[in-house]
A protein has these predicted regions:
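Positively charged
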Residues: 2-203
Length: 203
């Protein structure tokens, strides 16, 4: 078993008091986002698949902090999120879902391609609403009907900090709203009209 997979840099929690930081890892590198036992790999060549935390973890109920540093650590994080998203066969993934309380999500609706949304803010693009089924990688095995705006305008920053604006409709618009909810500590089950069981690996 790969040691780096065991020592997931974004989700490992350590309870012992002695310093057991593995070689090549740095403990708690970001004072503004302290997570006990949180490791960040400082030297590696490839992105990793991060563990996705599930409902009941307090990180999923917290309001995520804005991103202020557009540096190498952010690029590593985005690459990890991309690999984790595709490994899980998801449409969207928010940073809090891998225990990083930052205002970031990534998405790929199958048409627009992969995109990282940093510090996103959206607004409705019209009054039309749509109700459809949603799932969540952090709520495995449950799906629910959720009513959201059919079209949105999202403003965000890319991985270099450049400000962007995008119009979205359909699945991407739903994904943007769903993932932004994660950044505000909200799960789709809190908005669902009804819930039903289904496959455990979809979002």
């Amino acid at each position: 078993m790969n040691l780096l997979n065991l020592l997931n840099p974004l989700n490992l929690f350590r309870t012992e008091s002695k310093d057991t930081t593995p070689e090549g890892l740095t403990l708690n590198p970001e004072p503004d986002n302290p997570i006990p036992g949180h490791y960040f790999i400082t030297e590696r060549n490839e992105p990793i698949v991060s563990e996705i935390i599930t409902a009941g973890n307090p990180i999923l109920k917290a309001v995520a902090a804005p991103v202020t540093a557009f540096d190498k650590k952010l690029k590593f994080l985005i690459l990890d999120m991309k690999k984790t998203l595709y490994e899980a066969n998801g449409v969207g993934l928010a940073a809090p879902q891998i225990a990083v309380s930052k205002r970031i999500f990534v998405a790929d609706d199958g048409e627009s391609g992969f995109e990282a949304y940093i510090n996103p803010e959206w607004q409705p693009d019209g009054d039309e609403m749509a109700t459809d089924s949603e799932g969540c990688l952090s709520v495995p095995g449950l799906f629910g009907e959720v009513t959201r705006y059919a079209r949105v305008i999202v403003r965000y920053q890319d991985i270099h900090g450049k400000k962007k604006v995008k119009k979205a409709s359909g699945l991407l618009a739903r994904c943007i709203q769903h993932e932004t909810d994660h950044l505000n500590g909200i799960l789709f089950i809190e908005k669902a009209i009804s819930l039903h069981k289904g496959p455990k690996d979809e979002e």
